[in-house]
Amino acid sequence: MKLSNKTQALHDLIAPAVQACDVNLWGIEFIPQGKRSLLRIFIDKPVDETAEPVLNEDGETELGRGIGVQDCVRVTQQVGAILDVHDPISGEYALEVSSPGWDRPFFQLEQMSAYIGQQVALRLISAVENRRKFQAKLLLVDLENEMIQVEVDGKHVLEIDSHNIDKANLIYQD
């Protein structure tokens, strides 16, 4: 779960602007696509179980948690201005801002800690037991040793080095 140098540089550049919008930068994806690249920014807010419902600027009721359209608009404006000034992406690009959603991608090992016991989808760089793709139950996140432990097929436990994880996301379950 390591960001490329370009993605890390973009992350470092936009993080203060996102934070200024009172949301958390969950992660970013930078996808170079020839003449037109894509910069996708995921933002999140901590859950506030005690929040009272309020009307937002669009007249919608918000429960004090989750990302709303106005959050995405604010971040898009702030980050867009930063990118216009610093011009870190050569050529044209599209900027997308959204919440991580129910099937949220994980960008850092620490993010997975809150989802122990949940189902995750993993794509590995190098095969483990002749497989690169897994859907498994997350059992353990070991930050010190930079590894996770998952249960595959309800019975088989694997330890996976975080540096071997190419992509990971939560599997939404109703």
Swiss-Prot record:
Family matches, as CDD domains? YlxS_C
What Gene3D superfamilies does this protein's entry cite?
Answer: Ribosome maturation factor RimP, C-terminal domain, RimP-like superfamily, N-terminal
Entry keywords, A to Z: Cytoplasm, Ribosome biogenesis
Its Gene Ontology biological processes? Answer: ribosomal small subunit assembly; translation
Q: Where in the cell is it found?
A: Cytoplasm
Q: Which GO terms describe its cellular component?
A: cytosol
Q: What is its main location?
A: cytoplasm
Coiled-coil residues are none
What is the stated purpose of this protein?
A: Required for maturation of 30S ribosomal subunits.
Xref: PANTHER family? RIBOSOME MATURATION FACTOR RIMP
Q: Which NCBIfam families does the UniProt record give?
A: PRK14631.1
What is the name attached to this protein's record? Ribosome maturation factor RimP
The lineage, from the top, is: Bacteria, Pseudomonadati, Pseudomonadota, Gammaproteobacteria, Moraxellales
